[in-house]
Amino acid sequence: MTIAFQLAVFALIATSSILLISVPVVFASSDGWSSNKNVVFSGTSLWIGLVFLVAILNSLIS
């Protein structure tokens, strides 16, 4: 169970880092938002899901 928690935390950190870089780039590009809107929403949905997964796994471990 600890391995699953550590992998979920790593995935959350990796997703956060990717979104931290990609979202400003999408907003700064001229046609970026209209063409990459689905990718940003998918990444945000993944991030929210990982936050809940980490919270659930944390409650099971401690």
UniProtKB/Swiss-Prot annotation:
UniProt keyword list: Chloroplast, Membrane, Photosynthesis, Photosystem II, Plastid, Reaction center, Thylakoid, Transmembrane, Transmembrane helix
The highest taxon in the source lineage is Eukaryota
Membrane topology, as annotated, equals:
Multi-pass membrane protein
Organism expressing this protein natively: Magnolia tripetala
Q: Which PANTHER family match?
A: PHOTOSYSTEM II REACTION CENTER PROTEIN Z
The task this protein performs is described as: May control the interaction of photosystem II (PSII) cores with the light-harvesting antenna, regulates electron flow through the 2 photosystem reaction centers. PSII is a light-driven water plastoquinone oxidoreductase, using light energy to abstract electrons from H(2)O, generating a proton gradient subsequently used for ATP formation.
Name of the protein described by the UniProt record: Photosystem II reaction center protein Z
Compartments where located = Plastid, Chloroplast thylakoid membrane
How it assembles, according to the record, is:
PSII is composed of 1 copy each of membrane proteins PsbA, PsbB, PsbC, PsbD, PsbE, PsbF, PsbH, PsbI, PsbJ, PsbK, PsbL, PsbM, PsbT, PsbY, PsbZ, Psb30/Ycf12, at least 3 peripheral proteins of the oxygen-evolving complex and a large number of cofactors. It forms dimeric complexes.
Report the leader peptide range: none
* Hydrolase keyword on record: no
- GO biological process: what's one of them? photosynthesis
What Pfam family is a match for this entry?
Ycf9
Q: Which family does it belong to?
A: Belongs to the PsbZ family.
Q: What GO CC terms are in its UniProt record? A: chloroplast thylakoid membrane; photosystem II reaction center
The transmembrane segments are: 8-28, 41-61
Coiled-coil region: none
